[in-house]
């Protein structure tokens, strides 16, 4: 099987077909089949395949989709007309998981329908355009679709549906879709709404007249009304001869009076149909849909810009806030105009209420930097106290520590902590400052030390001592002995 893969050219496009039966990962041959791949990708960009079912399943052969009508007789190409086949010598239907274009049985009749093979199908080679292949473990999702139950017409009883096709790699960056997927959805929604409105109006029109209760309902004639249109005379009666006025009046009345025999029901029906047609055309019109989308985007961007400006103004006010009366007045007036604090001020108020409760109770409104400096100062004092406690006698240390604790209780952190605890018993024992860590003496440790402290005796040194021979190393290190030996030789 590996030699079959080796003969196929490299792919340059990739899509993922998201279906109700799972994802199907497809790689496309855009170089070998440019028209088929371009048609498939363009229809995908337009959302043409969204919601389309697999209308044909032949176990052991193919599964087929791409018809929005779901009958197998529909579909259109991106080019507006069927396009020709693209047969390549190295692309053959010799295994499962190959993607091809479906046609109506004749050559060069490709539109939007496609199929995926479930096994080798050599009878399709040189008759259908093969423009892609299934890769990875997603082939098993294709096989699951191929195992569905079908009726006599090879239609699955519960047909799976394509949710959407995601384009991962597009070899043709110059594709400009005729309509976007969002616009297509809006157009279809408008069509359905217009169709529902038309059906409801037809039902209402039929319900108004019930001739079934009359014995002559079928042969009832629609009553006719004579509609007369009269015009007033534009002459002055006091300046015209009476006989001549009567003559002209009768003449003009004959010319101006027109009798139009129009049944009222036909009038209403014609008007309603004209209104329905105009409303449906208006709802489905693509230009109106695009204009509406642009208006919604413009309105959303304007509201977003207004919110950004408002947030910037709030930030400027917070930076300038220094506790002055003018700033407080401007803030209060702006809050009155906004009918409440902004979101940013509310969040800052939450954090301010949680931060430094003891400092707020004592009336201390210093900034965060001052608080950090105070904390560091207290830590330095504490470390200094601990260091001094190790050098002084225990009695003096206890007295100094008690004095320091008394001072802290009078002012500063000790008072704030006392107020905060509200009568809770405080542990004021300061003996731990002079405490020393002492480990229990272990017999095993003493034994180990005794073993390590054994004296090492050199037997050669002991032998020299017994024989009375001098040590060469000692002689080298003592020059007096050397001179004595030399003087002895001279004698």
From Swiss-Prot:
Output the superkingdom of the source species: Eukaryota
Q: Does the keyword Isomerase apply?
A: yes
- Residue ranges under compositional bias (Low complexity)? 323-333
Top EC class of this enzyme: isomerase
* Gene3D superfamilies referenced in this protein's UniProt entry, alphabetically: Cyclophilin-like
Chief localisation class: cytoplasm
Gene Ontology biological process terms from the UniProt entry: mRNA processing; protein folding; RNA splicing
- Basic and acidic residues compositional bias, start-end: 186-202, 268-298, 306-316
Transmembrane segments in this chain: where?
none
Q: Where is this region: Disordered?
A: 186-427, 464-491
Where is it localised?
Cytoplasm; Nucleus
Q: Where is the composition biased (Basic residues)?
A: 352-367, 482-491
Q: Which reaction does it catalyse?
A: [protein]-peptidylproline (omega=180) = [protein]-peptidylproline (omega=0)
Name the keywords, alphabetized.
Coiled coil, Cytoplasm, Isomerase, mRNA processing, mRNA splicing, Nucleus, Rotamase, Spliceosome
Compositional bias (Acidic residues) spans?
Answer: 391-406, 418-427
Assigned protein family? Belongs to the cyclophilin-type PPIase family. CWC27 subfamily.
Function text: PPIases accelerate the folding of proteins. It catalyzes the cis-trans isomerization of proline imidic peptide bonds in oligopeptides. Involved in pre-mRNA splicing.
- Tell me how this protein assembles: Associated with the spliceosome.
Q: What is this protein called?
A: Peptidyl-prolyl isomerase CWC27
What gene codes for this chain? CWC27
């Amino acid at each position: 099987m590996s030699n079959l893969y080796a003969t196929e050219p490299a792919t340059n496009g990739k899509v993922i077909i998201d279906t109700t039966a799972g994802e199907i990962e497809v790689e496309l041959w855009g170089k070998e089949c440019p028209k088929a791949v371009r048609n498939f990708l363009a229809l995908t960009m337009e959302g043409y395949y969204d919601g389309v079912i697999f209308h044909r399943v032949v176990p052991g052969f193919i599964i087929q989709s791409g018809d929005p009508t779901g009958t197998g007789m529909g579909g259109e190409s991106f080019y507006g007309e069927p396009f020709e086949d693209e047969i390549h010598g190295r692309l053959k239907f010799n295994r499962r998981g190959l993607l091809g274009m479906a046609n109506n049985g004749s050559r060069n009749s490709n539109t939007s329908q496609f199929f995926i093979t479930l096994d080798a199908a050599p009878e399709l080679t040189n008759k259908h355009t093969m423009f892609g292949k299934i890769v990875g473990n997603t082939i098993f999702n294709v096989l699951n679709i191929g195992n569905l139950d079908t009726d006599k017409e090879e239609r699955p009883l519960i047909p799976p549906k394509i949710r959407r096709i995601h384009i991962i790699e597009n070899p043709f960056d110059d594709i400009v879709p005729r309509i976007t997927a969002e616009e297509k959805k809006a157009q279809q929604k408008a069509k359905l709404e217009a169709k529902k409105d038309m059906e409801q109006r037809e039902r209402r029109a039929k319900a108004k007249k019930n001739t079934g209760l009359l014995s002559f309902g079928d042969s009832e004639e629609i009553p006719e009304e004579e509609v007369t249109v009269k015009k007033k005379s534009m002459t002055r009666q006091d300046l015209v001869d009476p006989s001549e006025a009567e003559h002209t009046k009768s003449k003009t009345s004959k010319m101006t009076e027109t009798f139009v025999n129009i049944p009222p029901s036909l009038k209403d029906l014609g008007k309603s149909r004209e209104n329905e047609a105009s409303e449906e055309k208006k709802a489905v019109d693509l230009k109106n849909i695009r204009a509406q989308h642009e208006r919604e985007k413009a309105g959303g961007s304007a509201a977003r810009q207004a919110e950004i400006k408002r947030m910037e103004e709030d930030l400027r006010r917070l930076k300038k806030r220094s506790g002055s009366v003018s700033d407080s007045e401007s803030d209060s007036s702006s809050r009155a105009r906004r009918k409440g604090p902004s979101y940013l001020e509310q969040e800052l108020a939450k954090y301010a209420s949680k931060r430094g409760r003891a400092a707020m109770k004592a009336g201390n409104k210093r900034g965060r930097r001052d608080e950090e400096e105070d904390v560091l100062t207290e830590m330095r004092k504490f470390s200094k106290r601990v260091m001094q406690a190790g050098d002084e006698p225990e009695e003096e240390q206890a007295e100094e520590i008690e004095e320091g604790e008394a001072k802290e209780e009078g002012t500063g952190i000790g008072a704030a902590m006392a107020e905060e605890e509200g009568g809770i018993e405080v542990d004021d024992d300061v003996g731990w400052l002079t405490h020393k860590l002492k480990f229990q003496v272990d017999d095993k440790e003493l034994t180990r030390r005794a073993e390590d402290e054994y004296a090492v005796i050199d037997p050669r040194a002991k032998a020299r001592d017994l024989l009375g021979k001098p040590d060469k190393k000692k002689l080298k290190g003592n020059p007096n002995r050397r001179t004595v030996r030399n003087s002895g030789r001279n004698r």
